[in-house]
């Protein structure tokens, strides 16, 4: 507890939060199921100091909510008091200061509506991860594809006589 504030962060199932994401809370941040947050994104529910009283810790706070299947682009900033609606996308580098309705794409500084998404079924991370046996098969197939053409001879050659091709 700092300055009388207990921050709380709740993260739903099947979320992808990449390295370099900062989520800081003095009040409440709720991230729904199957959300994706890209590198460098910053999410905060507080000002962290007052405008005129910069010695006072935390400042104003308002909860942040991501509904299910939200995608936050690289280096986006989500400010206090924002709710991002289900299936919405926030573009890379966007600064979001106001609520984003469901099925919307917002980008820019300040973030504005770029596109309305069709109201149809989304294939989410929850679908992708629902069947672990199929997921393992998919990863095996991906490994076979990525490593195709590799051989023991090629590996030994790369150790003994490396060139630009390896």
Sequence positions of predicted segments:
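Short arginine-rich
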Residues: 98-103, 133
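Conserved catalytic segment of ABC-fold P-loop ATPases
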Residues: 85-88, 101-103
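Flexible, glycine/small-residue-enriched loop-and-beta-strand segment within the central core
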Residues: 1-82, 117-118
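Short beta-to-alpha loop/turn elements within the nucleotide-binding domains of ABC transporters
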Residues: 82, 94, 100, 109
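A generic "structured core" feature
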Residues: 67, 89-91, 95
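Conserved active-site beta-strand element of glycosyltransferases/polysaccharide synthases
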Residues: 106
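C-terminal segments of enzyme domains that contribute to small-molecule binding surfaces
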Residues: 7-13, 56-79, 109-166
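Short alpha-helix at the nucleotide-sugar/activated-sugar donor binding site of glycosyltransferases
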Residues: 36, 88-89
């Amino acid at each position: 507890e700092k300055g009388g504030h207990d921050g709380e962060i709740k993260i739903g199932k099947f979320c992808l939060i990449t390295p370099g994401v900062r989520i800081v809370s003095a009040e409440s941040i709720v991230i729904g199921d199957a959300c994706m947050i890209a590198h460098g994104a910053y999410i905060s529910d507080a000002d962290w100091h007052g405008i005129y009283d910069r010695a006072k810790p935390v400042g104003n706070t308002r909860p942040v909510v991501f509904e299910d299947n939200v995608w936050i682009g690289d280096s986006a900033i989500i400010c206090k008091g924002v709710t991002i609606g289900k299936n919405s996308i926030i573009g890379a580098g966007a600064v979001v200061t106001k609520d984003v309705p469901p099925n919307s794409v917002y980008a820019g500084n300040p973030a504005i509506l770029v596109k309305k998404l069709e109201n149809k079924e989304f294939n989410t991370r929850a679908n992708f991860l629902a069947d672990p046996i199929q997921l393992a098969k998919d990863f095996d197939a991906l490994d076979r594809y990525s490593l195709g053409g590799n051989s023991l001879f090629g590996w030994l050659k790369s150790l003994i006589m490396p060139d630009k091709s390896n």
